[in-house]
Amino acid sequence: MKKYLPILRTSPFFKGLTDNEILSILHCVNAATISRKRDSYIFRAGDSTEVMGLVVAGCVLVIQEDLWGHRNILSKCHAGDFFGEPYAASPGAVLNVSVVADEDWEILLLNVQRLLVSCPTICEHHQKLIRNLVGVLANKILILNDKITHVGKRTTRDKLLSYLSSVSIRQASLSFDIPFDRQQLADYLCIDRAAMSSEISKLQKEGLIKTNRNHFELTVCNDTDSGIKM
């Protein structure tokens, strides 16, 4: 497990913990590693789980799919990101999401239930870890709130501008990369890809954006871009 420490140190779940404490926790929560190829599923909707995943290599998509294959992307998790925490913390809860690999990946599986009972070794860092878990769950709520804000807009144009604006503000820059390719962006915003591509072309012609693949540059009035750098 020591080889994963550089990634684990950056994870909010292990914030404020020493390397020895992290290794002790991994033992406490029965950490196990698995690796799979792109497009393989880690969790499927309809299942239940007692473990949450931590990406240590590659990236995964948290999605919802219907019987006809229509995909709604809820989030994209890279190295250091968690997924499945709410379900792992709720024994017997049935997943209404699936987690699928966007590229070849390796993850750590952690048994959250071991954190919610008294630690048999009475770890001094146990309470700190629980506080960190609460912080991780709170951050997931904020991520979902962002998505609700974007998809709640009435038009494809408004959804795009809402999303691009939020990324720009979060990164404090008018020039930025997004984590999605075009199909994934359409799935995340719950819009048709062709309609989205048409709207992106219109926004470029109007001079509001410049884009190349997943890179975007926004153009705003001088009196509204204070605090955001090009």
Could you describe each region identified by the protein language model?
Residues 1-41, 87-90:
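Cyclic nucleotide-binding regulatory module and flanking cytosolic helices
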Residues 156-230:
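Phosphate-/nucleic-acid-contacting segments
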Residues 28-29, 47-49:
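Short, small/polar residue-rich loop motifs at catalytic or cofactor-binding pockets
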Residues 22, 95, 113-155:
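A small-molecule sensor/coupling module
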Residues 73-131:
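Cyclic-nucleotide recognition modules
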